[in-house]
Curated annotation (Swiss-Prot):
InterPro entries listed in its UniProt record: 4pyrrol_synth_GluRdtase (IPR000343), 4pyrrol_synth_GluRdtase_dimer (IPR015896), 4pyrrol_synth_GluRdtase_N (IPR015895), GluRdtase_CS (IPR018214), GluRdtase_dimer_dom_sf (IPR036453), GluRdtase_N_sf (IPR036343), NAD(P)-bd_dom_sf (IPR036291), Shikm_DH/Glu-tRNA_Rdtase (IPR006151)
CDD domains from the UniProt entry: NAD_bind_Glutamyl_tRNA_reduct (cd05213)
Biological role stated in the UniProt entry: Catalyzes the NADPH-dependent reduction of glutamyl-tRNA(Glu) to glutamate 1-semialdehyde (GSA).
Family of this protein: Belongs to the glutamyl-tRNA reductase family.
Catalytic residues, chain numbering: 50 (nucleophile)
UniProt subunit comment: Homodimer.
Name of the protein in question: Glutamyl-tRNA reductase
EC number: 1.2.1.70
Pathway as given in its UniProt record: Porphyrin-containing compound metabolism; protoporphyrin-IX biosynthesis; 5-aminolevulinate from L-glutamyl-tRNA(Glu): step 1/2
Positions bound to substrate: 49-52, 109, 114-116, 120
NCBIfam families for the chain: PRK00045.1-3
Protein's organism: Thermobifida fusca (strain YX)
Binding-site residues, NADP(+): 221-226
Length: 477
């Protein structure tokens, strides 16, 4: 059982390729299921966000595992294996563990330190559990990753310094908003609500608290990122928020939550197909629908009227893109998308406030070492169990032989002989079994377990049970 991580992210691939490998929820579930149906993959989990598509797997062998995952990823995305291998990265064992922990902390994010990725990792765990591809190895690894992410945000200043993709995007998009607009009555800044599962705020902080004061905002989509965006703009003083989603009742629920949480915000839901009709009254559109194609065309935006005197800004956080790039040709219309955000992040805009990265990296290193020590001890445990089981069988066999050869021994003597033989065997096994557990935590720990198996002709069964659908994460299986 070995952990393998294979993926593409904003660090390794162009945005155009990330768009093509982005996986919708249903496709992601099917991909994980098909992966564990191969002989090379025991468990599988997929983390898919606007900036990364990554597969985490428990495999028996490195090369067959990589080959199986690449082949299926190519089939499900339509991207050739040759193109995938040019841009993907592969991490194995300790490096794979370190990578996931760094991802969960936000160290590998486009906006270093952003907290949204922690919730996305948790959702990936839930998805894998739902379809039955989450086993003990990935469940333990994922739970540890969530713990590392929480530590990074609570024990350092990363939570204050690290912006989410939403807050970073709003900061960049805000540069195009009219600076001398007439402010409207708006909500006072509210205390950031916190996600009970991750401990991370469900709205993000902006460097300029007045950036959105009095703005009229439309949010396309009602998923987790859309909810984060809606809460963020409400918290920072937006006067009006329209929510448009293909499932209208989800848009209504989000609008109701905003109304309850921010009394001065006028929030309402509009049918998704009517979204373009409301553009004339909107300053900023935030889109992250998860659709597989354009949801607003340049023609629809142009029909909303001339914006030469009052700009209309689009913040497109979706992959694939939601907003037609041709809107950039329209007077007064500005589009900020993932590609532009990546360029801004590479300029240093995103990481300028992160002051405690060293402390976070230390946390990651500490947790990786602890996780590896536990894994090493777990790996040798079946060998120790098999050794003790074999010794027990030898004891029972010899005692049975003794009873057959000396049937006249009284019960008291027989019991004393039995205790003595078992004590001798236990004492003989105690030191080597304790020592092999200690040695197992070292870099060559597996060698000692293998030596025991060879010397005593052991064949321990190493279980790799899969979490059953419906079992709560972290529960005994």
């Amino acid at each position: 059982m070995s952990v393998l991580a294979l993926g593409l992210s904003h660090r390794s691939a162009p945005v155009t390729l990330l768009e093509r490998v982005a996986l919708s929820g249903e496709v992601r579930l099917k991909l994980m299921t098909e992966m564990v149906n191969t002989s090379a993959v025991n468990e599988a989990m997929v983390v898919s966000t606007c900036n990364r598509t990554e597969v985490y797997a428990d495999v028996d062998q490195f090369h067959p595992g990589v080959a199986a995952i690449c082949e299926l990823l190519s089939q499900y995305t339509g991207v050739s294996q040759e193109e995938l291998t040019q841009h993907c990265y592969v991490h194995y064992e300790e490096r794979a563990v370190q990578h996931l922990f760094s991802v969960a902390c936000g160290l590998d994010s486009m906006v270093v330190g952003e907290g949204q990725i922690l919730g996305q990792v948790r959702n990936a765990l839930k998805d894998a559990q739902h379809v039955g591809t989450l086993g003990r190895v990935l469940n333990d690894l994922g739970q540890r990753a969530l713990r590392v992410g929480k530590r990074a945000h609570t024990e350092t200043h990363l939570d204050k310094a690290g912006a989410s993709m939403v807050s970073f995007g709003l900061t960049v998009a805000g540069r195009f908003l009219t600076p001398d607009r007439e402010p409207q009555p708006s909500a006072a800044a509210a205390v950031c609500p916190v996600d009970g599962d991750t401990g991370v705020e469900v709205s993000a902080a902006l460097p300029d608290p007045q950036l959105l004061t009095g703005r009229r905002i439309m949010v396309l989509g009602a998923g987790s990122m859309s909810a984060l965006a809606a809460n963020t703009v409400a918290r920072h003083g937006a006067s009006t928020i329209l929510i448009a989603n293909r499932t209208f009742d989800r848009a209504q629920r989000l609008a109701e939550c905003l109304t309850e949480g921010y009394e001065s915000v006028r929030s309402s839901a509009v049918p998704f197909e009517d979204a373009a009709r409301h553009l004339a009254d909107i300053d900023l559109v935030i889109s992250c629908t998860g659709a597989q194609g354009i949801v607003l065309t340049a023609e629809q935006v142009a029909a909303g009227g001339d914006r030469a005197t009052r700009p209309l800004v689009f913040l497109d956080l979706a992959l694939p893109h939601d907003i037609d790039k041709a809107v950039r040709k329209l007077p007064g219309v500005h589009l900020v998308d993932i590609e532009e955000l990546r360029d801004a992040a590479e300029d240093g805009t995103a990481t300028g406030q992160v002051a405690d990265l060293t402390a976070v990296r230390d946390i990651v290193a500490e947790e990786v070492a602890e996780y590896q020590a536990v894994r090493s001890a777990e790996r040798v445990a079946p060998t120790v169990v098999a050794l003790r089981s074999k010794a027990q069988k030898v004891v029972e066999s010899e005692l049975e032989r003794l009873n057959g050869r000396l049937p006249g021994i009284d019960d008291r003597t027989r019991a004393e002989i039995t205790r003595t033989v078992r004590r001798v065997v236990d004492k003989l096994l105690h030191q080597p079994t304790v020592r092999v557990k200690q040695l197992a935590t070292g870099p060559e720990g597996a060698v000692y377990a293998e030596a025991l198996r060879e010397l005593f002709d052991l064949d321990p069964a190493i279980p790799s049970a899969v979490v059953k659908p419906g079992t709560a994460l972290g529960e005994e299986r």
